[in-house]
Amino acid sequence: MTKPGERDCVMSTDTVTSALIVIGEEILSGRTRDENISHIARYLNDIGIVLQEVRVVRDVEAEIVAAVNELRARYSYVLTTGGIGPTHDDVTTDAIAAAFGVEVAIDPRAVEAMRQGYSELELTPARLRMARIPLGAELVDNPVSRAPGFMLGNVIVMAGIPRIMQVMLDAVGPRLRKGRPMLSRSVRIDAPEGDVATGLARVQSAHPDVQIGSYPFFENKRLGTYVVLRSIDEAKLEAAQDALWILINKKGFAAASADDK
């Protein structure tokens, strides 16, 4: 498993970082399984933004405000999912406004967007809650259900429904500052993690600009280990992988590339 400090070893001063806040009692209660984290992580990685932290918070305005203010000061971007629907417990919009010290109002741009999906009779007061946007925010398009997300400062607010979140992420992605994509290599070793650990620590020590993580698995009644190497520098990544293969061959472990996993 990744040791403390390994994450920092692959970062540079021009790295673009991010955090994700998952908002919703239904996630914390186990009633709903989050399906957004892995999609967001992969999307951000592909455009050179490193996701460094994920938090799950309740639909409580004060708790959302605290998390947003802490994380937006620490990371290049903060993304949120959930809590921008039409019901009383959808408090994310108000929380983001409170975090930035701005007012919330019905946004004519949001209303116009929603008119493309709803008739005037269907634009009930409940649905118009989804047109409430913090002052100064940019809208994030939602071609699926029309009610937009928004971006205020370095905070991007999206829906929690996976399909809607995905189109919002596609819409906002081109606006974000890009970094160097994180590259990775994976190797499957048919040996327990404990047999690999000492040598793996030596490889990590010799290659501080590469993050090396080990992940045990149990298959066909046997223990094994996936080793994942990550870096923004391809040459350093390849050098670390070469060192890993030298270790594997020296120990006589059965192993194979797992980059398609």
Give the residues covered by each predicted segment.
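Conserved short beta-strand edge segments in small beta-sheet-based binding/regulatory domains
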Residues: L247-K261
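Proline/glycine-rich low-complexity loops and linkers
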Residues: E63-N69, D90-G179
